Regions:
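Helix/loop segments that flank and initiate small ligand/metal-binding modules
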Residues: 11-16, 27, 163-198
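RNase H catalytic domain
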Residues: 31, 67-148, 152-154, 158-173
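RNase H-like nuclease fold core
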Residues: 2, 6-81, 85, 100-101
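Broad hydrophobic/π-residue packing in well-ordered secondary structure
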Residues: 23-24, 37, 50, 104, ...
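Residues at secondary-structure transition points
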Residues: 32, 36, 40-42, 159, ...
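Extended aliphatic helical segments
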Residues: 38-39, 61, 87, 110, ...
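Alpha-helical structural elements
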Residues: 15-18, 41, 45-48, 128, ...
């Protein structure tokens, strides 16, 4: 079962009951665009899993943020046999949360990410996958590391021995097209008020 949580009542504090926390982020500085993710198990960085993904200069910050969530879903799908228990995916992008919660998805990237999240939640060992909002630059270690990975991915700097630098970006699609629609996806939990784009 997957769910989306657009408003975290704890102001972005990590959920301690979920053993797996995956933090994602996107970055764009001039023509440098990237996404990043880091994986934690019970509060500790898991096996050096820090990934940065290089995107094309024409990609936007919302695309990079959504691409980070897509890579988190792919990571869960690829590692289902090793991952037991609930997984929280944290993003500081309310735009991504709103786009993924929209029933009428117009962006190919958002649609692919949504499908992958559903597939990740239907895995062998994963009980639930929840995409949650976390406040940016508020001192959360995982969020700060994901931000660093996104910036390093944008510049194609090697992150760690396990790092991934992706040179083929998603198709240029706009996440904004999926934001602001009134309909919600059936079976997906959301909370919170409408938000503006990041």
């Amino acid at each position: 079962m997957s769910s989306l949580d657009c408003k975290n009542p704890n102001h972005g504090k990590p959920i301690k009951n979920d053993p797996w926390h995956i933090y994602t982020d996107g970055s764009k500085q001039g023509d440098l665009c990237g996404a990043g993710l880091v994986v934690y198990l019970r509060g500790k960085l898991w096996q050096g899993e820090c990934h940065g993904y290089h995107l094309q200069p024409e990609n936007s910050v919302p695309q990079a943020e959504c691409y980070g969530a897509k890579q988190a879903a792919l990571f869960i799908t690829k590692n289902q046999r090793r991952m037991h228990g609930a997984v929280s995916i944290f993003t500081d992008s309310q735009t991504t949360l709103m786009a993924l919660n929209n029933y009428y998805i117009k962006s190919e990237l958002v649609s692919e990410t949504s499908d992958l999240l559903d597939r990740a939640a239907g895995g062998i060992n994963t009980t639930t996958v929840t995409l949650r909002w976390i406040k940016a630059h508020a001192g959360h270690e995982g969020n700060e590391k994901a931000d660093e990975c996104a910036k390093l991915g944008a510049t194609r700097v090697q992150l760690t021995k396990n790092a991934t630098i992706l040179c083929s970006p998603p198709n240029r699609q706009t996440v904004y097209a999926a934001v602001g629609q009134a309909c919600e996806r059936p079976g997906v939990r959301t909370s919170g008020s409408p938000v503006s784009a990041d």
